[in-house]
Amino acid sequence: MTYGGRDQQYNKTNYKSRGGDFRGGRNSDRNSYNDRPQGGNYRGGFGGRSNYNQPQELIKPNWDEELPKLPTFEKNFYVEHESVRDRSDSEIAQFRKENEMTISGHDIPKPITTFDEAGFPDYVLNEVKAEGFDKPTGIQCQGWPMALSGRDMVGIAATGSGKTLSYCLPGIVHINAQPLLAPGDGPIVLVLAPTRELAVQIQTECSKFGHSSRIRNTCVYGGVPKSQQIRDLSRGSEIVIATPGRLIDMLEIGKTNLKRVTYLVLDEADRMLDMGFEPQIRKIVDQIRPDRQTLMWSATWPKEVKQLAADYLNDPIQVQVGSLELSASHNITQIVEVVSDFEKRDRLNKYLETASQDNEYKTLIFASTKRMCDDITKYLREDGWPALAIHGDKDQRERDWVLQEFRNGRSPIMVATDVAARGIDVKGINYVINYDMPGNIEDYVHRIGRTGRAGATGTAISFFTEQNKGLGAKLISIMREANQNIPPELLKYDRRSYGGGHPRYGGGRGGRGGYGRRGGYGGGRGGYGGNRQRDGGWGNRGRSNY
């Protein structure tokens, strides 16, 4: 018998050895779950609505009254592997030290060191091994036992450290222990992410590893029409990955609800707060039963994120991989050139000549404004470089196309603004070039972290101008911590009187010789009808028609 696209005979009860029976699990009688005192299906959320299609302000339920009416659920699935159990405290301490791992909280499970030790059921473990991973990352070694134990948790680790699988795989186990969705039910797992690009990437991982369990997922984000997302939600999805604003839209018009959510993930919590999503996050979380399991993931641990965790996590445990001090990956070579605005264009060409010596190069260039993105891209294409731009003025279809062209290497140069690039995770980026420096040191670290991921090496090049002097001291500190060469021209900005500002890196490897211009992009060098010096930008390279 099938129900809602999921095979009723797909039996996960053989997972009993990991935590007893799951109170019926996903193959139990759904009628017992649907026999709720509040009645009916969940469409319309708490309190219902008289007009299903009209936006209604979300009201926080009275959980003292509502929670006793809801069915109980299982969230602790962790059974410690005997190899893990037999490790001594000194061995565990040494492992955590080697992986720069800091923990806080009580009754924290020991870290695992192999996929088999995690205790995932075969239907999850087989998917992981099929991807060819050698061993878990540091955050996964400690994060999986934490998440599988059902505890609220905070995970702090650098971008690209494997955080997505740290919550995705335990989420799949969690779903398979719950009763099946009934018509009108919302998701069981909700993942909130700051950007549509990150949301789509999370969806890709959920689809890949949830396939064997026939788990459905839906990605809900702004910038595109709601119609397809509404259809997907109406069919029922165990996992919803969403940006906060669009999810609130869907909740207010009654197209989904959060009454079945028992596993909540806040991914890149620091970025969501940086982007001003705190009110939306609080409004969403208030709609979710308070006995849920909540997992918060972040690259940094500022006071705003700490406060959010204090307000919504219950007796959390925490793991941090790396220092709490802001730092850059030591796999990244940081090169900084102190330049004028008029020198940037020549320096950019120099580094592209170097990067292009690698036949599989990918270079991500950051600019400060949408206009500058387009200007740089136009100039590069006229000069024969295969460049495309991505920023907020482009519609979602074009953004997706540009990202795909960059990802598969057909256009190995992408120019982006910070907002457009947030959440983008593209494998194999060799170079990051900060044509314009970001507004703060955190964004600098986040930008250059697009290269040098998952053990690979990368190069970050930054053009630092006099206007960026406020970032000088912090930039130098980041470089020193990573044992980078600091150019003498930058050292004059090493003054503690400068507060937060913008780092500007530039740098130079010498070029490796000529680069044959690629055909088929743009229209040669002539005929550009504009002054390249507008926006303080291109300067005069002595070429005709510029």
UniProtKB/Swiss-Prot annotation:
The gene that this protein is the product of is DBP2
Residue positions of the PTM Dimethylated arginine?
509, 512, 518, 525
This protein's GO cellular component annotations are: cytoplasm; mitochondrion; nucleus; ribonucleoprotein complex
Domain spans labelled Helicase ATP-binding: 144-319
Q: Per the record, what is the consequence of mutating residue 268 to Q?
A: Abolishes enzymatic activity
Enumerate the residue ranges of region (Disordered).
1-56, 493-546
Q: Cross-link Glycyl lysine isopeptide (Lys-Gly) (interchain with G-Cter in ubiquitin), residue numbers?
A: 474
**Other remarks on record?**
Present with 33100 molecules/cell in log phase SD medium. The gene for DBP2 has an unusual intron both because of its size and because of its location near the 3' end of the gene. It may have a function in an intron-mediated negative feedback loop regulating DBP2 expression.
What name is this protein filed under? ATP-dependent RNA helicase DBP2
Q: What is known of its domains?
A: The Q motif is unique to and characteristic of the DEAD box family of RNA helicases and controls ATP binding and hydrolysis.
Name positions with the PTM Omega-N-methylarginine: 18, 43, 509, 512, 518, 525
Q: Name one GO biological process term.
A: rRNA processing
Which annotated residues bind ATP?
Answer: 157-164
Query: Where does the record place Basic and acidic residues bias?
Result: 18-33
Which E.C. number(s) belong to this protein? Answer: 3.6.4.13
- Biological function: ATP-dependent RNA helicase involved nonsense-mediated mRNA decay and ribosome biogenesis through rRNA processing. Associates directly with chromatin, correlating with transcriptional activity. Required for assembly of mRNA-binding proteins YRA1, NAB2, and MEX67 onto poly(A)+ RNA.
Assembly and interaction partners: Interacts with UPF1. Associates with polysomes.
Annotated region RNA-binding RGG-box: the residues are: 505-530
Q: Which organism is it from?
A: Saccharomyces cerevisiae (strain ATCC 204508 / S288c) (Baker's yeast)
Q: Which family does it belong to?
A: Belongs to the DEAD box helicase family. DDX5/DBP2 subfamily.
What residue intervals hold the motif DEAD box? 267-270
Q: What is its main location?
A: cytoplasm
Question: Phosphoserine (modified residue): where?
Answer: 88, 90
Composition bias (Gly residues) maps to 498-540
User: Motif Q motif: where?
Assistant: 113-141
Query: Which reaction is catalysed here?
Result: ATP + H2O = ADP + phosphate + H(+)
